[in-house]
Design a protein with these regions (language model features):
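Active-site gating loop/helix substructures
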Residues: 132-161
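Short, charged beta->alpha transition segments
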Residues: 126-132
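Short coil/turn connectors at secondary-structure junctions
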Residues: 8-11, 136-138
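Short, conserved beta-strand segments within well-ordered enzyme catalytic domains
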Residues: 14, 76, 141-143
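Patatin-like phospholipase
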Residues: 10-12, 19-118, 124, 152-161
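A short, basic/flexible loop-to-alpha-helix module at the beginning of a structural domain
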Residues: 1-7, 33
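Short, flexible segments with low predicted structural confidence
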Residues: 3-4, 91-96, 137-139
Length: 161
């Protein structure tokens, strides 16, 4: 099956969340750019919202650099956990781990109400130029959740004050 996109048309692009899927989305964006596909609206949630902002900025180079340089410590403070602890847990290789120590560290995270994502906030502020996004010819819509209300929110970023 051969997929053909009409490059005389302009498209809207929807991006999903899911952490590492963000790198895949940047690869798709690069392929669309190389194919000459135009877009005038992007919607996204979580990492899709971040990539959507980069798309609204028309800054593929910055997006590629972001994903090449990303590390776990750039998006969260792991507290007592090391990156190696996290990698081992994610791989499911618990046999070589001190489970008592790991459980103690996990309990500390729960007591502290989760991991500190201040590094993620700082990184997003560094990467996204809000003024460029708001003034872009690409309309950006993001889906998020209000933690206080526990309700979904849809935001048209270009129309924010």
């Amino acid at each position: 099956m051969e997929l053909k996109l009409d490059t005389s048309k302009t498209y809207a692009i929807a991006l999903e969340g899911g952490g590492a899927k963000g790198a895949y989305e940047i690869g798709v964006w690069k392929a669309l750019e190389q194919a000459g596909v135009k877009y005038n609206a992007v919607s996204g949630t979580s990492v899709g919202a971040l990539n959507g902002a980069l798309m609204a900025m028309h800054d593929l180079t910055r997006a590629i650099a972001c994903w090449r340089d990303i590390h776990l410590n750039k998006v969260m403070d792991l507290g007592a956990l090391s990156e190696d602890d996290v990698k081992q847990m994610m791989s499911g290789q618990f046999e070589n781990m001190n489970l008592t120590d790991l459980f103690s560290k996990a309990l500390d995270i729960v007591r502290n109400r989760g991991l500190d994502v201040a590094p993620l906030r700082a990184w997003v502020r560094e990467v996204v130029d809000v003024k460029r996004v708001k003034e872009s010819d690409v309309q950006l819509y993001i889906s998020t959740v209000s933690i206080t209300d526990r309700k979904g929110l849809e935001v048209h970023v270009n129309e924010l004050p």
